[in-house]
């Protein structure tokens, strides 16, 4: 044990001597073997009154912050021009006013909207109510025809069951002598 302690002291002082750093005396003798470990330049201070600060491992917030920055950028990139466009439309065009419909004139479906942007969207992107009505009527007609065909099919199946006829009469049955029953008679062979 004493040899290990002596070896440790010698190695520390040798490293300190080679590096050029001064060592403080440990026992007061100032000899080569009695020197201690290198002293720190300043006492160790921990910031705050709660002792040593710890390094907590947390998940990275890089992607969250990047996403939020890009979200703000693209909202500003699209939101500002849209706000300017809506303001210009409201100032220079304005909302539609209710007026008397001339005799014999049938208004288009987008003319019932008050705001010009709503009118433009209804004219270019929405279907007219007549088209929606016709499409719904076509779907209802197809569903009614399908239901009627299902009822007819049920009636046909019921009559086939009652009368004893069916699709098996349309196919010729094979001769019984052609069927080989030997695998069933001796399954272990």
UniProtKB/Swiss-Prot annotation:
Subcellular location: Mitochondrion inner membrane
Disulfide bridge partners, by residue number: none
Presence of keyword Transport: yes
Key words, A-Z: Electron transport, Membrane, Mitochondrion, Mitochondrion inner membrane, Respiratory chain, Transit peptide, Transmembrane, Transmembrane helix, Transport
Keyword Protein biosynthesis in annotation: no
Membrane topology designation: Single-pass membrane protein
Transit peptide: 1-46
GO CC annotation: mitochondrial inner membrane; respiratory chain complex I
InterPro entries membership: NADH_UbQ_OxRdtase_B5_su
Chief localization: mitochondrion
The protein's role, per its UniProt record: Accessory subunit of the mitochondrial membrane respiratory chain NADH dehydrogenase (Complex I), that is believed not to be involved in catalysis. Complex I functions in the transfer of electrons from NADH to the respiratory chain. The immediate electron acceptor for the enzyme is believed to be ubiquinone.
Oligomeric and partner information: Complex I is composed of 45 different subunits.
Protein name in the entry: NADH dehydrogenase [ubiquinone] 1 beta subcomplex subunit 5, mitochondrial
Classification lineage: Eukaryota, Metazoa, Chordata, Craniata, Vertebrata
